[in-house]
Amino acid sequence: MATEDDDSFRILVATDTHLGYAEKHPERGNDSFQSFEEVLELAVEHNVDFILLGGDLFHENKPSRYCQVRCMDLLRKYTFGDRPVHFNILSDPAVNFPHTKQVNFLDPNLNVAIPVFSIHGNHDDPAGMGLLCALEMLSSAGLINYFGRVSDLNDIKISPVLMEKGNTKLALYGLSSIKDERLHRLFVENKVKMLRPKESLTEWFNLMTVHQNHAKRGPSNYLPESFLDPFLDLVIWGHEHDCIKEPRHSHQNFHVLQPGSSVATSLTPGEAEEKCAFLLQVNSHHQFKVDPLPLKTVRPFLFEEVFLSEYNIEDEVKRIKKTELTKEESTWELLMKAKALGEAKGKGRGRGRGSKASDAASQAQIKDNPVELFVEHRVRELLKGAKKLLTGHPR
């Protein structure tokens, strides 16, 4: 984008926050909430007009009460206040937000400073009686504006949220998560239609957010970019956890931004990429600019593949023993001692000599196993690398 003007939309974009992931873990239980709070802090810091979330706000379809309360408290803390909202909604709220029939910042009973717009993902999709999802609870409480839900899975019509800020017109399309094979079939059968404003088509910046497989994981187990309408300008692609910092130009002539997740939920190379939120700016000249905002509260995560066939393990172990294992006890020895201590406390006098002998044999086996020693050394090196990634953030 060439220049920012007073009419420019400033949007904080994030996807896949997975609130509640590993919430019972003694070490990692707070990770998802810390990163989500940082996303909200960035929205306040960068004085955005609204926050756009691309699905999987929650990790579980039925988030715990603890998780729901943490989420609601954070949203109230950072998105409510006396700051005025500087854009208008031109479309029919009853169509865009069928559950509440209105956008939250126009509710006279609420003081919303930074509106949040969100679609649902595959983790927090509607289910159970009434086919409701956790986002509808947040919507009923006036904390978010839940949009992009499909009411008829045999004939999908996507109606945009039409926004105006000065001379800038923004059409926001949302498509919440649908099973990839089903959505693929509906597109093939021409049963997905994206509605457009009736007037001044060229004046609108067309922004869409989806939550589907981006990478091809089978003949129909993904959403091809070619299925989306070419009149779009930018697509925010949720569901994929790899963070791709630069918008990519597709063959359909629109750009695609894949923000990735804000917390690692699986042991894959993509989760080891630096995690970011994004500041999206759209001006009155139909231009946009995307700035990655690296998240500083994310727990460092390193991923490495080791092919033992590429190493002479015996030589590697000799080198390791000379340089590292002669200086301090190995991690495995410490783990075995901790295990033995825990069992001794648990069983007390009930332990016999046979058990102690078994522990000693296990320690000796681990210490003398060259593969174990080699892998342990690689883990030590990864931990050293992870320490260098710490940002010094107070959380």
Predicted regions located by residue number:
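Short amphipathic alpha-helices and their capping/turn segments at secondary-structure boundaries
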Residues: 1-8, 35-45, 162-163
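His/Asp/Glu-rich metal-coordinating catalytic cores
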Residues: 2, 50, 62-266, 271-274, ...
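Non-catalytic terminal accessory segments
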Residues: 9, 89-92, 309-395
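Short, hydrophobic/glycine-enriched beta-strand segments
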Residues: 10-16
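Amphipathic alpha-helical interaction motifs in eukaryotic regulatory proteins
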Residues: 15, 37-40, 44, 72, ...
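Acidic/histidine-rich helix-loop elements
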Residues: 19-34
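Active-site metal-binding motif and surrounding structural segment of the metallo-beta-lactamase
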Residues: 39-59
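Binuclear metal-dependent phosphoesterase catalytic core
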Residues: 159-166, 258-334, 338-341
